């Protein structure tokens, strides 16, 4: 039965017992649903969670985690976790990734309880500050560890979506961001990196604060699109197995996004997406790609097929490509195309990826002490530099000292 097509045509058919049979089928398979969570870590991540909440994303639990109790209080989410409340007293990390890391480790049990039982976990965070940079990798690790400890046959898929600072934000923040991305690569299957400078090229006249909101909107729309294409009926579905095959072990990834309402709108939207890359890499360096279209009700499958021909022409012949499309009446005549490519190389941000994924400098033995453990100190470079051979105290060190802890 083409029930949806009949419904869209304004035809209502009511066969005796049909609804009862349909209900029985739904009940029989309801236990096999895909469980999805979106976890926002730190201020930027929390902003994305609030935006997703306002957008009404269907099919995912929204979880906010932060060291800043005040920001967490105004974040709209289904679950909230205050990280390291005995370390920061809910006052934030002071921009220090070390404090973000310690706070997340101190709240490991609460994090594990919040992320248990999911098949796909998105982690959103801004790289370069304290909580997102330091805590997000810990959250990613705990997602994996919790599943293993509970005897899960298949580990959850962990996809991190992060922003990389503007160059104008300074070298210290950029170095912190690089460090955070390197650590996220340890425990995330895929890390999608949105370079703020590339974002600004799309909307160069936006004030800085508006540019940050635009980044939040982009991440929220991307996550919403993937979640709802998996969970809801679409014109062409991307199922969980498709996402898993593209994202599992995908490593660094980029997103390109484009829109068009021209006569050749689907093709133009894809070309715009391939041009408007959010990370400075060359297309063709990626190994796999996920393409998602958001379209109005009048877009034909033929238009989408022509657009996909462009994708196949632009990407490497060896690339594995999955695509899907869903209808959103609010799009009107506009087509939006989103391209996510995994396995990319970006020397400026990532350098030698293989060298960065050596877990010996990140995985600390289970008997670690959170405060005063020299093994933890080795994980954190001196982001602030030094003078005359002496380490410059960080904001995080000051917070820990104020709370009575020894400096790391």
Curated annotation (Swiss-Prot):
Compartment list: Cytoplasm
Which sites bind GTP?
130-132, 169, 173, 216
Record keyword Cell cycle present:
yes
What are the GO MF terms of this UniProt record? GTP binding; GTPase activity
- Chief subcellular location equals cytoplasm
**Quaternary structure, from the entry:** Homodimer. Polymerizes to form a dynamic ring structure in a strictly GTP-dependent manner. Interacts directly with several other division proteins.
- Identify the HAMAP family for this entry: FtsZ (MF_00909)
User: Its family?
Assistant: Belongs to the FtsZ family.
Q: What does this protein do?
A: Essential cell division protein that forms a contractile ring structure (Z ring) at the future cell division site. The regulation of the ring assembly controls the timing and the location of cell division. One of the functions of the FtsZ ring is to recruit other cell division proteins to the septum to produce a new cell wall between the dividing cells. Binds GTP and shows GTPase activity.
List the protein's name: Cell division protein FtsZ 2
Look up and give the organism this protein is from. Answer: Pyrococcus furiosus (strain ATCC 43587 / DSM 3638 / JCM 8422 / Vc1)
